[in-house]
Each structure stands twice: as structure tokens, then as C-alpha cells.
Amino acid sequence: MGKVIGIDLGTTNSCVAVMEGKEPKVIENAEGERTTPSIIAFANGEKLVGQSAKRQAVTNPRNTIYAVKRLIGRNFIDPMVRKDQGIVPYNIVKADNGDAWVEADNNKYSPSQISAFILQKMKETAENYLGDKVTQAVITVPAYFNDAQRQATKDAGKIAGLEVLRIINEPTAAALAYGFEKSASKTIAVYDLGGGTFDVSILEIADGVFEVKSTNGDTFLGGEDFDTRILNHLIDVFKKENGIDLSKDPLALQRLKEAAEKAKKELSSAVTTDINLPYITADSSGPKHLNIKFTRAELEKLVDDLIEKTIEPCRKALQDAGFKASDIQEVVLVGGMTRMPKVQEAVKKFFGREPHKGVNPDEVVALGAAIQGGVLNKEVTDILLLDVTPLSLGIETLGGVFTRLIDRNTTIPTKKSQIFSTADDNQHAVTIRVFQGEREMAKDNKLLGQFNLEGIPLAPRGLPQIEVTFDIDANGIVHVSAKDKASGKEQKVTIQASGGLSDAEIEQMVKDAEQNADEDKKRKELIEAKNAADSLVYSTEKTLTEYGDKLSSDDKGAVEAALAALKAVLESEDTALIKEKTESLTAASMKIGEAMYKAQSESQPAAESATNDEKIVDADFQDVEKK
């Protein structure tokens, strides 16, 4: 079994780690950074990932996709999706299956596809470091992700060419990294406020056993919402001062978003910051500039309710685990937003203790995923992880009631069966509708999917016995079966959301990804060939100017001809031709090298002679006769 990498697929940034010996290690990307922006852009037929996509976002807002994790596994009519539609500059569109997809460069992409591009970047980062192919990964998700979101994340891994050995909850991964090689027994809370989601998990750690007691959260609450509050504040202030609404200008919106994120980060360490955006827009009177002094107090006032929204899930998680706040011995902070002083203050106030700041909130989740990868491939042998399902699972029964089979915070993997019957006389088929959530009526919960059990022998209602079995695997993914006890007829399914990607769609996306990988590789080769050729043209022209007169007319003519031939193909898209002409010029320009060497050799003796002459000192002397 090869190396298993751990990937924190984040809303704002992503991170990859691997076990190196007995320690997990974060791997730096090609730019030398330990995290990679979770941003994809399409520009001039080229796909950009990470920092390169982020750099051009201001000039290409419509085709720059960020925070797609907030859309993954969601339906287009989801209120949370509608909320994001009014904020992001790119288009969120309805897919044929009803899911929320994104549109860029005149193409539609599923959130799983966009996530796959980020995962491919993480995979390449690991392969470059390890010098070997990587095919297996542990990928993290918010603890409060439902089945559809987990399935969609697993699909993203498959599209990226990865076998996803395990989907692991982010707070659990953080706890693994925190408690790794620590012997003390502790009850801890992991407070994870990231770029797009919030989770809190209560765990007991003892002798290498990490047992999740409960989890809670909000999959649509994170740093992006804090940025939006600042962005809207800037729009309001500018409108008040200039009478211009910037919310309809995609270019201005992208600049405002970047300024909001920057100001938010600065105010974690400073109490005031200046937001300066020259030439943000223009009207008949000329260009307009945005210049605002923004304070930490103003920021805290803008986002106070968002911070408060994280406290109720903490209260519920403690209640479900059967603990009081005073029972928690350590509170581990995870996610970039926990750097905000007001967030730390709220956590301290609720739990009654200073939160632990000894882990890097941007990296700890990836480190934990790498440790879990080590457990799965037997590199790490003294750890047992017991996670839970975040939401109750059940089916719709008579009257639209939600009947639970598995309660939230049940340790996984788990299996549970229950006997149901028919609602009508002589009913020969039943439809099993599977839901996930905490509401009493099925329609108020998340429909995960449905299937039919047919061929039930005709009988009065209430007589047939239909055994419904729920099986949740270690990834938190649901498998359901229904069996008629009389006939033995059985129907089994891995729940696929009412939307979601079909196997055929995933297969096509895998092929597209492989094709794109080949195209990306060819594009990279072309760019590298052009760069090498351009560099050679420059150096040849320079040396030809300096030493051209030392060449014979034949040699000089050969170099000039090869130089002209290379310059003529520089703008072409033919990598092989550019390489061929580069090699020809390299061979021809060897004559310049010989001329340079000869010229230097000839000047060397003369220089040495002059140096020696300088060392001779004329002196007066006289003979002294011996006495």
C-alpha cells in the first residue's frame, strides 16, 4: 500500500499532509505555501487553480469560482443557495437534476467537479514532494455535512483520480492531531469556525482511543459570511457618500470582497485599518475612490450575531454528550476565523476557560487526516477513532411523520432494523422515502432519496411485515435495504440524493479530468518551451552584439539564421517545433561561445604581463667593496 495523503478540502483554503515516519507533515505547494486558496478560474481557455486563480480574480470575476463547498450536495432551490446567489459574482445555475451548479467560461460545472480541480492540485502537490504517484486519500468534511454532501465530496475525490479511503469529520481530524502521541486522558471540545462552515464536537480521548460523544454545527456559517457583512457595509457607506450602488458591478464587488477579507484579517491584530480602493468606479463627474477607516469595534458590531450563532450548537453538543461546560478540560480552536479576538472571547465566556491555541488552525485538520491515513495503511497502529453520525436518519411513515431508525450522535459504523407494514389493503408495493434531520415531520427534513419494494403478496393492511435496515458506514454514508419477510423479496440501495451525480456522470467527469490533466501538461510544456526559447533569443542577441565581430562571416550567418528561425516560431502553439528550433540555435550559438573563450584567452596573457610589470620596482643601488 502506497502513501495515503490527508486533505483538508476547505471553503477558503485547502491543505494536504502526509505521514513522514511517525509524524504528520504539511506539504508546501509549488508556490512555497502551506495552504492553497480553494479558487478555480477559467481564463483564455486555461484553467487556473489556487493562488494563480486568486491573483486574477479582480479582472475576471465572472469566471472565478470560490467558496463552492457551500454549494456541494445542495439543491438549487435551497434557501442557502439563493442567499449566495445575490453575493457571488459568478453564476449559480440549476442543473438538470435540480442541483446547484456553477457557470464559467460558457460551461456548467458541478460543485464536485470544481472541488475535484482543487483536489487534483493537492494530489499533484503531494506527488511532487513524495516523488511518487498518489492514488489514495482521506478527505475531511464538516461534521454537520449530510449524506448528500458527503457523497458529493467522495465523488469529487473520484473525479480527481483518488480512491477516497475515508471521509472524516473536520473536528475529529483536528482532535486526532491535537491528541496524537499524548497519553493524558481528556474530555475536549473542538470549536471549528472555518471559511464557510461551523462545527463543534465533544470528544473523550484516552489511551489512543478518540471517541466522539456528540457533534453539532451549521454548514452555512463561516468566514465568507463575515466578509459579506464587511462588503455590504462598504457598499452602504460608499452609496451614502457618492450615491452610487456598487453591488451591481462585478469588478467592484470582487475588489470589495478582497478588501473585506484583508481588513478582517488585519483587525485580528490591529484595532483600526484603512480600506483604500482607488478608481473603484466612475460617473459623469469623473473617477471615484473608496477610502474608509474601519475599526475592530465596528467589525465586532457588524458580526456580533454571527458569533452568537455559534454558541447554540455548542450548548446542544454539550447537552447531547451529557456534559456541562465545566466538564470540558480543553477547548481546541480550529479554522482561520478563530484568530478573531471576539470569537476567542465568546468561546472563553461560554466554556469558562481560555481556549487552547497550541495548534495551527489552518493546518491541524489536514494533519489529522494524514494520521487517519496512517491508521488505514497500518503506518499508525495505536489509535482507534470512534466517530458519530451528525443527524438522525429515518423514513416517512403514514401521515408524513418522520420515524427515526438511527438517532443523531450514534457511533458509526452502525446498523439498525425496524419492522413496518402497509397502509392500505392489498398493497403490492411500498415506496421507502429516506430522510435525515431532527424535525418531526418528514417534509421538514432533508430527503436523501427513495426506492420501491415491489411484489409484496396481497394482504389486508398492517399484515405484511417489511423490515427496513439502515447501515451507516465509517464515512457516514447511508445504505438502506427493505425486505418483505413473507416473500423474501429485498431491495438494497446506497442512498443517492434526489439530485446528486449518477455513476455515468461521474465516469464522464473522470474522463474529462484525465483529458484536462493531459491538456494542462501539454500547455505547461508549451509555456516552458516558449520561456526557454525566449531566454535563449535574448542571450543570443546580447552575445552576438558583443562578440559578433569575432565570428567568421559563415558562423555569424548561421547563428543569425537560426536566431531568425526560432523567433519566427515563438508565437506558434507547436511545442516540438519550438524545441527543435531552440536546439538548432543552441548548436549554432556554440560558435559564439568559442569566440568568447578565445577572446578571453587572448586578453588573459596580456593582462597577466601587465600585472607582472606593475610588480617590478625600479631602485637605485651601489656596489659596496669588500673590506
Curated annotation (Swiss-Prot):
<dbReference type="InterPro" id="IPR043129">
    <property type="entry name" value="ATPase_NBD"/>
</dbReference>
<dbReference type="GO" id="GO:0140662">
    <property type="term" value="F:ATP-dependent protein folding chaperone"/>
</dbReference>
<dbReference type="InterPro" id="IPR029047">
    <property type="entry name" value="HSP70_peptide-bd_sf"/>
</dbReference>
<dbReference type="Pfam" id="PF00012">
    <property type="entry name" value="HSP70"/>
</dbReference>
<keyword id="KW-0067">ATP-binding</keyword>
<feature type="compositionally biased region" description="Basic and acidic residues">
    <location>
        <begin position="612"/>
        <end position="627"/>
    </location>
</feature>
<feature type="compositionally biased region" description="Low complexity">
    <location>
        <begin position="599"/>
        <end position="610"/>
    </location>
</feature>
<protein>
    <recommendedName>
        <fullName>Chaperone protein DnaK</fullName>
    </recommendedName>
</protein>
<dbReference type="InterPro" id="IPR018181">
    <property type="entry name" value="Heat_shock_70_CS"/>
</dbReference>
<keyword id="KW-0346">Stress response</keyword>
<comment type="function">
    <text>Acts as a chaperone.</text>
</comment>
<dbReference type="InterPro" id="IPR012725">
    <property type="entry name" value="Chaperone_DnaK"/>
</dbReference>
<keyword id="KW-0597">Phosphoprotein</keyword>
<dbReference type="GO" id="GO:0005524">
    <property type="term" value="F:ATP binding"/>
</dbReference>
<comment type="similarity">
    <text>Belongs to the heat shock protein 70 family.</text>
</comment>
<dbReference type="InterPro" id="IPR013126">
    <property type="entry name" value="Hsp_70_fam"/>
</dbReference>
<dbReference type="GO" id="GO:0051082">
    <property type="term" value="F:unfolded protein binding"/>
</dbReference>
<dbReference type="InterPro" id="IPR029048">
    <property type="entry name" value="HSP70_C_sf"/>
</dbReference>
<feature type="modified residue" description="Phosphothreonine; by autocatalysis">
    <location>
        <position position="197"/>
    </location>
</feature>
<keyword id="KW-0143">Chaperone</keyword>
<keyword id="KW-0547">Nucleotide-binding</keyword>
<feature type="region of interest" description="Disordered">
    <location>
        <begin position="597"/>
        <end position="627"/>
    </location>
</feature>
